[in-house]
Structure formats: C-alpha cells, structure tokens
C-alpha cells in the first residue's frame, strides 16, 4: 500500500508539472534551432567585460548587486543627471518630502544602511558642532558609547569607524543598566515587542535610539510605523526591497538628529562620514523608490512572486524524496520564499553540494544555502552574533529577485541536479 500510495503521489506531482515540462521542451527546441542557425546568446554590458550575469534566487544580497531598480527610479536618475544642484539644499528638500510621506521629522539619503548607521552615530556624538564634527573619530570629551542591543554584528564597523565604543547588551535590563553619562546612542535591529521595550527605555533615559531595518521594506508601511512608534532614528537600505539605487539608503527620524547626521556627512569637507558620498542621482532615485512603493499594489506584486516560485515547486517536486514548503519571513526580506528539502545523508548530497552545482551552472544560479561568500572570515571565527548556528537542512529560493521567465530555467536546472543526485544514491 505504501508503494502504491507513493507512486500515486509521484504521478499526481508529475501531472501537475506537465504543462511546465512542455514549455521547457519547447524552449530547448527553440534554443537548439537558434544555435544551429548561428544565433548565439545575446551580449550585454557585463558579458562584453567577461563577467557572467547571475539568476538570483538568493535575495537582495549586496555581493550579488542587491535588487533591480524600479523603472521609475531609473528614469528619475536619468533626469537628475542632467543638472547641477547644491547637495545640502537637495538633501533638506528631500527630507521635507520624506517627512510628508512617512510622518518622520525629516530624512536624508545615505550610502546604504551602513552609511546611515555611521551618520546617525556621528550625529549623536558630535551633533551640529563643527569643532566636534572635525574632531571625530577622536571622541575625547564627547558622549561616545553605543549600546548594542543583542550584541555585535558583521555591520558594527559602521559604528566603530566614527570613534564610538560598543557596549554589548542582550536584554532590556542590560540595555537600561548599560546607560551612563557617556552613552551617545542605542542601536538595535529588534522588532515587535522587543523594539517597543527599547523605545520605552530610550525615552525614559533620554538616549537616542537607532533602528536598523535594512531589509524592512516591503511592507512600505514600516516607513510610517516607526515614526508612529516614536523611534528617534531608523534606516532602510535603498538597494534591497526598496528597489532604489544599490548604493543608497534612507535615514529617517527626529529633525534635529537628521540635520546633525547631514552635517556629519558628505558633502561637508572634514566630516567623518564624508567618504560615504551619495550623488544627486542616488538621492533622487532613493526618494523615487519610496514614492513608487506608496503607489504599488503590494497584494498584486506578492501574487506575481508566488506564481514564480510555485512553478519551481511543481518542477522539483517531481523528483522522488524532495519536499517543499513556502513561507514569508517575518523579520525582514519579507518575500515568498521556497524551501526545498531532501535526505542529505541518504543521498550523500549536501545543501552545499547543491548550491555549488547551481553556482557552476550556465547561467549561474544562486540560492540560499550553507554559505555566505561575502562574509569576512574573521567575523565568522569571532562569532559576534550570539545566535546558535545550525547546519542547514534545506535550500531556499527567494521570489523577489527572480526575473519573469527565469523561474523556468531555475526549476529545470534544480530538478536536473536533484534528480541526478537521487539516481546516484538509489
């Protein structure tokens, strides 16, 4: 009975994937005919340099160049590139527009979330005092300690480079007890109830709090939510879900702190954050990205993303022993995500093996697996994050960065890789 039931389930899965398999066969036939006629793959600006493009199922990782900009963003940057403008005036004007959109006191465009972290830290230490701005990263005579809620991260160098000293705290009680006359800021990437408690502590102790929610959009309402919660400063990456310029970010919050962050940043000569330059194109592009999100039908977009990973799911489920599930993370990168699992030990085929084979494909396919190629090895060895790391038991494919049509290529290739591994183990 078990064998019959298993065969029946396999047949049903194969039947569900039949239309997709037919599309793949037709596409392969066309590709072979094109090659026979001497029509090769289309060249692009990267291939002409000898750089291979990637089918990105991993998500908005910086080392894979983040996300793809909204068409509106590309057009806005093109228009912005045709004029000269005073950058301080532009940032303040954009700040007023960001305030209208979000309810925050003001905002500036930064060089990513890391740039926002640095600018916010400098603002809390030096304020708008030019003598202190020029003095950084020497913090003599300034409040210079930053309480790190939850401990260290791979990104805290953005805070340390301003001259700030990190003070690690892993609970609300530790945060409160860590605050003293030298405390300049509290940093957190916590959400929900934890964030509410931390906001309350910051208000009670009169210490500014910076929330780093780099991957917090979508939903775009988060840009308003943190203002409603009274978070002093909060930041988003421009090159992740926001779909703005990859080298941009948004720092929003109290008007006085945002002005101080601006004065500690480019274009001001002598400011510690001067190297973290953003151009007029990035400033306009990042603002346009946020405006575009407020006009976007998120339900429709999520439906499109779900369709893409559902096609991949139907194809890979035709391989015996493969199981799948779909979920949306609740702590950032909130996109429909496909989990694919198999018995690694029985197959003699690990998550790393699968990710490696997909990365060696033509075209290259990147998935979430066991590795992080962009991490400085010393960070891993130092284990700055207190969370226990477990060996992964699945790969993940993130829908948001899969371009329309690529799901068929991914589904076909992943199916072939898993089928070959299953047959070898059988």
Predicted regions and their residues:
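General small-molecule cofactor/ligand-binding pocket signal
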Residues: 108, 165-169, 325
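Structural signature of PLP-dependent enzymes
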Residues: 290-313
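Conserved PLP-enzyme active-site core in the AAT-like
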Residues: 12-15, 19, 35-55, 59-67, ...
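Conserved N-terminal alpha-helix of the aminotransferase class I/II PLP-enzyme fold
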Residues: 70-112, 123
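Generic N-terminal amphipathic, Lys/Arg-enriched alpha-helix
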Residues: 54-63, 74-81, 337-339
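Conserved C-terminal alpha-helix-loop-beta "cap" of PLP-dependent enzymes
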Residues: 317-417, 422
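Short glycine-rich or small-residue beta-strand-to-loop segments that form or flank ligand, phosphate
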Residues: 63, 78-81, 105-111, 147-149, ...
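N-terminal export signals
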Residues: 1-5, 10-33
């Amino acid at each position: 009975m078990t064998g019959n039931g298993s065969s029946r389930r396999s047949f049903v899965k194969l039947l569900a994937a039949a239309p997709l398999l037919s599309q793949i066969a037709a596409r392969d036939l066309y590709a072979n005919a094109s090659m026979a006629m001497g029509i090769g793959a289309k060249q692009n600006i990267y291939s002409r340099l000898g750089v291979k493009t990637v089918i990105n199922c991993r998500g908005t990782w910086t080392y894979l160049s983040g996300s793809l900009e909204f068409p509106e963003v590309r057009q806005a940057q093109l228009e912005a590139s045709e004029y000269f403008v005073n950058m301080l005036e532009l940032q303040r004007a954009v700040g007023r527009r960001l305030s209208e959109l979000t309810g925050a006191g003001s905002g500036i465009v930064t060089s990513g979330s890391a740039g926002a972290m640095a600018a916010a830290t400098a603002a809390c230490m030096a304020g708008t005092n030019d003598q202190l701005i020029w003095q950084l990263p020497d913090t003599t005579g300034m409040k210079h300690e930053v309480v790190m809620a939850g401990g260290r991260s791979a990104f805290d160098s953005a805070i340390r480079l301003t001259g700030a000293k990190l003070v690690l705290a892993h609970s609300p009680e530790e945060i409160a007890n860590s605050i003293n006359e030298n405390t300049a800021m509290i940093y957190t990437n916590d959400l929900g109830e934890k964030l509410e408690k931390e906001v309350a502590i910051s208000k009670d102790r009169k210490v500014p709090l910076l929330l780093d929610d780099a991957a917090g959009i979508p939903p775009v309402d988060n840009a308003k939510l943190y203002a409603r919660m009274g978070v002093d400063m909060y930041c988003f990456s421009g090159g992740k879900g926001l779909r703005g310029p990859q080298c941009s970010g948004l720092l929003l919050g109290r008007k006085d702190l945002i002005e101080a962050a601006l004065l500690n940043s480019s274009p001001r000569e002598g400011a510690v954050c001067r190297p973290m330059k953003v151009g007029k194109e990035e400033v306009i592009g990042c603002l346009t990205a946020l405006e575009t999100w407020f006009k976007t039908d998120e339900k429709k977009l999520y439906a499109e993303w779900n369709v893409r990973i559902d096609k991949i799911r139907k194809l890979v489920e035709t391989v015996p022993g493969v199981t799948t599930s779909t979920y949306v993370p609740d702590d950032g990168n909130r996109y429909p995500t496909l989990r694919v699992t198999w018995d690694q030990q029985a197959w003699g085929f690990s998550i790393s093996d699968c990710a490696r084979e997909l990365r060696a494909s033509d075209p290259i396919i990147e998935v979430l697996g066991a590795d992080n190629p962009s991490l400085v090895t010393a960070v891993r060895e130092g284990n700055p994050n207190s969370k226990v790391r477990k060996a992964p038991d699945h790969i993940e494919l993130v829908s948001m960065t899969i371009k329309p049509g690529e799901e068929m290529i991914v589904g076909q290739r992943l199916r072939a890789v898993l089928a070959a591994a299953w047959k070898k183990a059988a």
